Amino acid sequence: MELVLNDDQKLLKESAEKLVERYGGPDAHRKLRDVESGFDKGRLKTIAEAGWLSLMVPEKADGLGLGITDLALALEQAGRGLVTEPVAALAASARAVGTGRAATGAGTEQALNSLVSGKNILIPVLQDPTVPAAKRERIFAEHYHYGYQLTGTRTGIPFAEVADGFLVDANTSDGTILIIVPRDTFGITVDASRTVDGTAHGTIDFAEVTLMADELLIAGVKQGEKLAADIYIRIMLGVSAEMLGVMEQALDLAVGYMQTREQFGRPIGSFQALQHRAVNDHIQIELVRSLLYQVCNAVDGGHGSRAMVAAVKARASEAVLSVTKSVIQMHGAIGFTDEYDAGLYLRRAMTLASQYGNASEHRESFVRHSRLDAEKAAEPGKRRK
């Protein structure tokens, strides 16, 4: 599909381009590789001040009330500039807290303000509820006095070590709840490790973590699963938008190099084999762009599906690795050096492609959700679409 931006979206995209040009880029990324958090907290504050974290917070909770399409426009630029802050995850958490406040008054205004200002890092710890039982990482929440006691483990959570709190979907005897778990709560253990691009992820273990529900419960059993699914799909689309930006900038690097690097007395960009490779990479990028924004618009319109989102993440994860590897090959030996920028985009691609599930896992997810959608449509009394 052709993406037609309205005036507000054009301004948002231009603003994001300027922010990333000023605060992002390969040089800024290199400086962060030795930082424990893997990102710049000062830059996160700047991003928050630009309104990215409050984009999807409902207007009833004093947010901007915009959609994932708008956030994707900003995150596409973030991908171009190797901005590693977990914007998609934090913006999704802010939406969850804001939605809870708007619907039931759950949470506190102070907690939401701390989140959208970038002061509080609330990392989602969510999982697709349709994952096969053998791969499922359940977190159980037992009723305990006036709250809950959480037990379970989740692996591969981005920025788990530096989080101030976690947004957890937990299973109770009555259904799924969505609850905030402060990082310093007794019983939480985080085992962190670094990824190839210098950021971090970790395994979180909840061992009889006791919580009072008054201020921490975002959604009870009636809305918990639905809200958790909404947040999960928005994170998938946000990360896919970052991958789109990574691909675009990586290919731009290669095209620029081919126009200046000469062999046999002529630019290597004049060689048909490299032209064909660049065109194939461009086609992959445009396929991801079209699918991404089509699904973003569908989600914002209230008729998106989990199968569609899985298709986006699978396509983007596969394409970003293919394009960035191709870019390395188009550069030749210089592409392998740490001093050259192309390798930074490959490393970023490797991290984003595996976040929240790789291409293979999301293809499986697409099949599961497509089957579930078909079964639901075939139920008696359901009109086939």
Model-assigned labels for residue ranges:
Residues M1-L82, A103-T104, S114, G118, ...:
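Alpha-helical interface subdomain recognition
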Residues L66-G67, A133-R136, F159-A163:
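Short glycine/proline-enriched turns and hinge-like loops at secondary-structure junctions
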Residues A111-N113, D128-T130, R138-F140, R154-P158, ...:
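A generic local secondary-structure boundary/capping motif
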